[in-house]
Amino acid sequence: MFSRLGGQEAGELAHRRFVLGDTSPEVMAAWLKIALPLYKQKNLDPSAMERVVMNREATAWFNRVGGEGRQFDMLADVPNIQCPTLILGGQLDPMLPIECQRDIANALDPRLLSYREFEDCGHGVIPDVPELAIPLLRDFIKNQHTSR
């Protein structure tokens, strides 16, 4: 998805970071400039990257070979969720592909699930389409409050 959204350079950068586990300062600087903006598809704020705070040591530890970022898989535990759950999925999400979001939704008890996909959205559905996502979020919260 990174290649699709940002071209060969973004795809190669994602490969270096996630497949090879390269969290070197040069890769992380390129990540902030090239790949991180791809998480959103709309309402891009050119100064947003200036406000990003990242702990490089924690990121390197999490994404190292053998680290949690490479092994973390919660899917087997998803059926244990016993509370109402809202998933707003962006079909252009490079960080958690829509197929993975569908797997999570399919693993949940359908009586507890509110699920909606957004065609032209990335990882941040609310910033991408606030006019659609915020009412869904408000309704979800309101319905939980009134159903008690």
Regions found by a protein language model. Give the residues of each.
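Active-site acidic short loop of glycosyltransferases
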Residues: 82-83, 110
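Conserved hydrolase catalytic core segment
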Residues: 1
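Alpha/beta-hydrolase
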Residues: 4-76, 83
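Alpha-helical elements of Rossmann-like donor-binding domains used by nucleotide-donor carbohydrate transfer enzymes
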Residues: 30, 34, 102-103, 132-139
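Active-site-adjacent alpha-helix of alpha/beta-hydrolase-fold enzymes
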Residues: 102-113
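Short beta-strand/loop motif that positions the catalytic acidic residue
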Residues: 81, 87-89, 93
